């Protein structure tokens, strides 16, 4: 067998200067981030969120619920029901959360809001009782 002398392989270990180069880079990085924190308004995100909402009387999208909205709505509501959320319809022996969610959807009693985003960044909020299934 041949002895392994190590050759040029350092095993992933790289030598570095212990002269404090890391601390200098860290100081430079924190100085630049402090300049940005002075400019940011903490309520700016909340203010722009309400500006993107379209009022109910100016809605542009259709009143029909898409199959994707229905699937997400049923899945979310079934998850809530499985975690002991209050049920909004009378049960007739159903124990499956998905079947209960279907029954709530048919009765238009699901207490969720569907948010539809538009290409321009605006959005519309629709309640389940406003949409046709």
UniProtKB/Swiss-Prot annotation:
PROSITE patterns listed in its UniProt record: RNA_POL_K_14KD (PS01111)
SMART domains the record matches: RNA_pol_Rpb6
A Pfam family reported for this protein in Swiss-Prot or TrEMBL: RNA_pol_Rpb6
Keyword set, alphabetical order: DNA-directed RNA polymerase, Nucleus, Transcription
Annotated stretches, region: Disordered: 1-55
MF terms (GO), sorted A to Z: DNA binding; DNA-directed RNA polymerase activity
ATP-binding found in the keyword field: no
Record flagged with keyword Acyltransferase: no
Ranges annotated as biased composition (Acidic residues): 1-32
SUPFAM superfamilies per the UniProt record, alphabetical: RPB6/omega subunit-like
Compartments reported by the entry: Nucleus
Superkingdom classification of source: Eukaryota
GO biological process per UniProt: transcription by RNA polymerase I; transcription by RNA polymerase II; tRNA transcription by RNA polymerase III
GO cellular component: RNA polymerase I complex; RNA polymerase II, core complex; RNA polymerase III complex
Stored InterPro entries: DNA-dir_RNA_polK_14-18kDa_CS (IPR020708), Pol_omega/Rpo6/RPB6 (IPR006110), RPB6 (IPR028363), RPB6/omega-like_sf (IPR036161), Rpo6/Rpb6 (IPR006111)
Functional note: DNA-dependent RNA polymerases catalyze the transcription of DNA into RNA using the four ribonucleoside triphosphates as substrates. Common component of RNA polymerases I, II and III which synthesize ribosomal RNA precursors, mRNA precursors and many functional non-coding RNAs, and small RNAs, such as 5S rRNA and tRNAs, respectively. Pol II is the central component of the basal RNA polymerase II transcription machinery. Pols are composed of mobile elements that move relative to each other.
Family assignment from sequence similarity: Belongs to the archaeal Rpo6/eukaryotic RPB6 RNA polymerase subunit family.
Subunit structure: Component of the RNA polymerase I (Pol I), RNA polymerase II (Pol II) and RNA polymerase III (Pol III) complexes consisting of at least 13, 12 and 17 subunits, respectively.
Protein name: DNA-directed RNA polymerases I, II, and III subunit rpabc2
């Amino acid at each position: 067998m041949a002895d392994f002398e190590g050759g040029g392989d350092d095993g992933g270990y790289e030598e570095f200067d212990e002269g404090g180069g890391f601390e200098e880079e860290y100081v430079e990085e924190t100085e630049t981030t402090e300049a940005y924190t002075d400019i940011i308004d903490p309520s700016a995100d909340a203010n722009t969120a309400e500006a993107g909402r379209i009022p109910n009387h100016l809605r542009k999208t259709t009143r029909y619920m898409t199959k994707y909205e229905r699937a997400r709505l049923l899945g979310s509501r079934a998850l809530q029901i499985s975690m002991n959320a209050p049920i909004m319809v009378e049960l007739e022996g159903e124990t499956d959360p998905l079947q209960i969610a279907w029954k709530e959807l048919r009765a238009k009693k699901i207490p969720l809001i569907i948010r539809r985003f538009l290409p321009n960044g605006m959005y519309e909020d629709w309640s389940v009782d406003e949409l046709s299934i």
